[in-house]
């Protein structure tokens, strides 16, 4: 039995894992148990506790669907097996033109295999908006023209964090410092355009930027 700790909030993904379990059982006699979690940080905490207790074999977690923040935490705490990715039969099918060698700017070093591709996509109704903003600068102008309409999910919700990451990348023209470990010396300078933008945006955002949606719905 393989215990796979993964977010359980998508019915489509849950259905896929149930299908994968049936395939594994019929072809290899292996049972895949989907351990549904709300936040993968729960699994990070569990692994740290098991390691501290000296439980180096027979633990409760075999595989984990992990995000960049928790990948870095697990890597720093030496909780990950590997490197292993080049031993995977499917590795040759992975599109190496994608940034599979880093996660949230943290080098993966073969300790993490791609599970999917996450992209921030803005969707609009062409019947009501036929000329949508094509940049964050245009989005700010749109928000000022139509106040109290736009917002973003409150970080650390994934889409809210992704919104801010994409914003700071555009505003700084992908400053090289953003791909390095953060330090106090350049943080204020590099991120200044972000805070200036948000100060302007929040003035005209939904509920004046005092409240934020909890998710994307």
Question: For the regions a protein language model found, what residue spans apply to each?
Answer:
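Early extracytoplasmic/lumenal segment of secretory-pathway proteins
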Residues: 1-73
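Extracytoplasmic/periplasmic solute-binding protein
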Residues: 5-6, 107-113, 120, 144-178
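Structural recognition of the beta-strand scaffold that forms the well-ordered cores
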Residues: 3-6, 33-36, 62-65, 114, ...
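Extracytoplasmic
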Residues: 27-29, 42, 108, 117-119, ...
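Flexible hinge/capping segments at coil-to-helix
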Residues: 129-145
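Ligand-binding pocket segment of bilobal, Venus flytrap-like solute-binding proteins
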Residues: 151-152, 159-217
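A structural signal for short loop-to-beta-strand junctions that line the ligand-binding cleft
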Residues: 52-66, 76, 80-126
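Sec/Tat-exported extracytoplasmic proteins
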Residues: 27-28, 51-55, 68, 75-78, ...
